[in-house]
C-alpha cells in the first residue's frame, strides 16, 4: 500500500511518482471517456513513459494551480429513465470527465481524505470508509428501542436536502476549507479547477455550447463527495453551536445521525429541535 505524504498547511510537498503510478493503475476500465475520447485502458497501457509524463504534468499543476483546458471540461450525456421520454424529467444526466485528469484527481483525493476524515464529526455514515448506513440504521433502531423501553420521549426530524450536491456555494466551500486549516496549496489547486470548469451537452452526436457552473460540486468528479462532506460539516457545526443535546446512549450525547446527505435530528423535547435544525428546513 502506498503511504501518502502528510501535507500540512505550510508544506508544498511535491507529488510523488508512486502516487501517480498508484492512481494510473487504479483507473476504472470499460467506462465512457471524456471530451478527449481517451479511455482509461489507453492511459494504463502507456506504462512507465506515461507515468513519468503524468508525474511531470501533475507536479506542474500542483506548483502553479493551472489545469490543462481538457482536464477542466465535462461532457454531459443523457440517459433515459422510465416514463414519457418527451419530458426532460424522465432523463438523468451523467458528466464525463477525461481520464488523464482523473490521475491527478485521485492523487488530490488521497491527500484530501485524511484531512477531511479528521474534520468530519462521528455522525455521518455512507460517505466514508468503514461507516455504512446499515450500521447507522441499526444504531437508530437500538436508540429508539431503548427510549421506548424506558417510556421516554424521543423526537426526530428528518431532513432531505433537495439537490444537495448542486447547491454547494463555492466561495463558502473554500472559506470553510481555510477555516478548517486544509493545506493552502491543495485548496488553491481545487479552487482553480472549479474556476475553469466548463461543461457541454452531448446529444445525437453533436455537442452544444460550453457553459460555466458557479454553484454545486462537479458531477462525476472524484473529489465531490469529500468536498460536499466538508461543506455539510460546516453547516452542521454552525447549526448545532451551543446546542448540548439531551439524547444519550452509552454515555454519549447524540444530536443527529447522518445518512449520506440526509439528516436525522433528534432530541428529548420537541422544542429542542426547532432552534438548531429549523433554519436548515427553510428552502
What are these regions (language model features)?
Residues 1-89, 95, 103:
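Surface-exposed loop/turn segments and immediately adjacent short secondary-structure elements
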Residues 20, 24, 34, 54, ...:
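Mobile genetic element proteins and their domesticated derivatives, centered on retroelements
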Amino acid at each position: 500500500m502506498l503511504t501518502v505524504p502528510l501535507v500540512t498547511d505550510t508544506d508544498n510537498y511535491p507529488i510523488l511518482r508512486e502516487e501517480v503510478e498508484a492512481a494510473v493503475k487504479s483507473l476504472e476500465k470499460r467506462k465512457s471517456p471524456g471530451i478527449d475520447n481517451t479511455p482509461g485502458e489507453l492511459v494504463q497501457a502507456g506504462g512507465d513513459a506515461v507515468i513519468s509524463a503524468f508525474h511531470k504534468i501533475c507536479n506542474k499543476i500542483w506548483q502553479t494551480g493551472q489545469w490543462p483546458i481538457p482536464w477542466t471540461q465535462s461532457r454531459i450525456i443523457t440517459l433515459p429513465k422510465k416514463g414519457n421520454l418527451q419530458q426532460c424529467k424522465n432523463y438523468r444526466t451523467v458528466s464525463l470527465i477525461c481520464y488523464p485528469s482523473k490521475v491527478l484527481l485521485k492523487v488530490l483525493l488521497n491527500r484530501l481524505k485524511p484531512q477531511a476524515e479528521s474534520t468530519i464529526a462521528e455522525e455521518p455514515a455512507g460517505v466514508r470508509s468503514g461507516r455504512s448506513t446499515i450500521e447507522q440504521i441499526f444504531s437508530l433502531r437500538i436508540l429508539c428501542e431503548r427510549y421506548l423501553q424506558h417510556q421516554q420521549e424521543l423526537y426526530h426530524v428528518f431532513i432531505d436536502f433537495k439537490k444537495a450536491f448542486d447547491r454547494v456555494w463555492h466561495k463558502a466551500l473554500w472559506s470553510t476549507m481555510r477555516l478548517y486549516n486544509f493545506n493552502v496549496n491543495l485548496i488553491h489547486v481545487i479552487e482553480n479547477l472549479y474556476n475553469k470548469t466548463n461543461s457541454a451537452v452531448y446529444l445525437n452526436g453533436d455537442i452544444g455550447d460550453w457553459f460555466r457552473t458557479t454553484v454545486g460540486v462537479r458531477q462525476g468528479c472524484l473529489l465531490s463527495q469529500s468536498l460536499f462532506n466538508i461543506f455539510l460539516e460546516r453547516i452542521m457545526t454552525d447549526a448545532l453551536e451551543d446546542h448540548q443535546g439531551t439524547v444519550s446512549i452509552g454515555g454519549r450525547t447524540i444530536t443527529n445521525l447522518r445518512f449520506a446527505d440526509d439528516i436525522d435530528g433528534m432530541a428529548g423535547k420537541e422544542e429542542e429541535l426547532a432552534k438548531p435544525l429549523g433554519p436548515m428546513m427553510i428552502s
